[in-house]
A protein has these predicted regions:
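Active-site groove signature of glycoside hydrolases
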Residues: 2-30, 62, 112
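Surface-exposed amphipathic alpha-helices with a cationic face
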Residues: 2, 31, 35-47, 51, ...
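Aromatic-lined carbohydrate-recognition surfaces of secreted/lumenal glycan-active proteins
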Residues: 40-61, 107-118, 156-168
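Extracytoplasmic/secreted cell-surface and envelope-processing proteins
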Residues: 23-28, 32, 59-62, 83-86, ...
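Aromatic- and acid-rich polysaccharide-binding/catalytic face
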Residues: 12-19, 54-96, 117-118
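Aromatic-rich peripheral "rim/lid" segments of glycoside hydrolase catalytic domains that contact
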Residues: 123, 127-137, 150-204
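Distinct, well-ordered alpha-helical segments
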Residues: 1-5, 28-33, 38, 55-71
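Catalytic-core region of carbohydrate-active enzymes that cleave or remodel glycosidic bonds
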Residues: 94-112, 125-156
Length: 204
């Protein structure tokens, strides 16, 4: 990352160190002091902004303030579907969480690094307990349109999660929710939001 950042600064605009390494439910947690040392090392060796990406339930914890102070900007993951929201309240909840994190870290740029809506889920396991909202292409389109209307109006930088379905993710069952967050299917055929993208753009 250091080499690439220094070699291609006109192409790479920032460097992210670690993904969901602080949040309590992560299966690959990294101690704050360890992550801090990684961030400092990279910051000392590049001129690009440096950050780490994590769930809102990491950025709202006092024990992670050291990391928030160290990064150049915050990358926030906020998934209303995983939080048990129905589609009708999903954008309001996302806005609420963003504002809460912004209130905690007033002097930081906050980039929403992950948000979206899955198009399938399995009816067994943890996802069956946590996910209450209906999944599907109609619901995904509805969430993205509502989210973008808010985020674009407020000039909030964001990444939609995600471009393509990833069939290798999660468990073996084909309906496993982790496989189905893409705006396109794994074979690159578009889902409903992307099928209608031109009409959405022309209307706005």
């Amino acid at each position: 990352a250091i080499y690439l950042g220094n070699e291609y600064p006109s192409v790479i605009n920032s460097i992210n160190i670690g993904n969901e390494t602080l949040v309590f439910w992560s299966d690959h947690r990294v101690p704050v002091d360890t992550l801090s040392s990684y961030l400092k090392y990279v910051k000392n060796n590049v001129s690009l902004p440096v950050t780490t990406a994590d769930d809102f339930n990491a950025w709202n914890r006092e024990e992670n303030k050291k990391i928030a102070d160290l990064v150049d900007f915050i990358v926030l993951h906020v998934h209303p579907l995983w939080a048990g929201l129905q589609i009708e309240g999903s954008v309001d909840w996302t806005r609420k969480i963003y504002n809460e994190i912004k209130d905690i870290h007033k002097d930081k740029l906050i980039v929403i690094g992950e948000t979206g809506w899955a198009t399938q889920k399995h009816n067994q396991g943890l996802q069956a307990k946590l996910i209450k909202g209906k999944t599907g292409e109609v619901e995904q389109e509805q969430f993205i349109l509502g989210f973008k209307k808010w985020a674009d109006t407020k000039n909030i930088p964001y990444f939609l999660f995600e471009v393509f379905d990833e069939n290798w993710k999660g468990g073996d069952h084909p309906n496993e929710v982790e496989k189905h967050w893409g705006l396109f299917k794994a074979d690159r055929t578009p889902k409903l939001y992307m099928k209608n993208y031109k009409s959405h753009y022309e209307q706005n």
